[in-house]
């Protein structure tokens, strides 16, 4: 699923609220039928949610390998962690080539791959991606979104916040339109692609 909205509509705030970084004034937040709004961020991650934040937010002075290990901080089964490390390296071959490299010296696209890989190391049921294409070249954007499709096809739910509305809707099954913090429209992604209001506001009227 994807969340659309203009700048300052509340998309990133929505992500932060889900992960306990911003506290809602009212209402509840549920994941898999259980309330999570009063949980600590670490406990929210343990419950099956993972966040790839805007601007990636990797640990720049740590190695790529250490960054990936941080994604599995809540897990104790080292055999499974090693299996997931191998799986992440399979998804992102560039990461495998740079496991000993200091993460802050990687390119923007490589750092985005690392941030996504780190999120997968927690074995999430849902990955939340906040503006994954920001600052990337068109070729790298295509790589990132192909990876999003692969993650989805492996059975992980993807919640995508993305300025590229056309690309986001082409990947999603369902979309939500946010204005000043409120969901004003929701439908299947296919229907939103042909919705006149959505086309005018987010798809350039095409």
Segments (PLM) and residue ranges:
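Glycine-rich phosphate-binding loops of nucleotide-dependent enzymes
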Residues: 1-206
């Amino acid at each position: 699923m994807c969340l659309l909205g203009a700048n300052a509509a509340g998309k990133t705030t929505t992500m932060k609220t889900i992960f306990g970084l911003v506290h809602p004034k009212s209402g509840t937040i549920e994941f898999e039928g259980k309330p999570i709004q009063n949980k600590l961020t670490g406990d929210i991650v343990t419950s099956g949610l993972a966040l790839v934040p805007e601007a990636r937010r990797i640990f720049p002075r740590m190695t790529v390998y250490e960054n990936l290990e941080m994604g599995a901080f809540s897990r104790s089964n080292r055999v499974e962690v090693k299996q997931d490390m191998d799986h992440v390296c399979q998804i992102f071959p560039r990461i495998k080539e740079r496991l000993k490299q200091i993460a802050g010296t990687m390119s923007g696209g490589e750092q985005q791959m690392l941030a996504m890989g780190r999120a997968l190391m927690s074995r999430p049921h849902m990955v939340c991606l906040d503006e994954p294409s920001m600052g990337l070249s068109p070729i790298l954007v295509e790589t990132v979104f192909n990876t999003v499709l692969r993650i989805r096809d492996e059975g992980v739910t993807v919640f995508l916040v993305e300025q590229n509305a056309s690309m986001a809707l082409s990947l999603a099954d369902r979309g939500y339109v946010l204005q000043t913090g409120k969901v004003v429209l929701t439908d299947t992604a296919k229907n939103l692609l042909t919705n006149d209001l959505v086309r005018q506001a987010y798809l350039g009227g095409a």
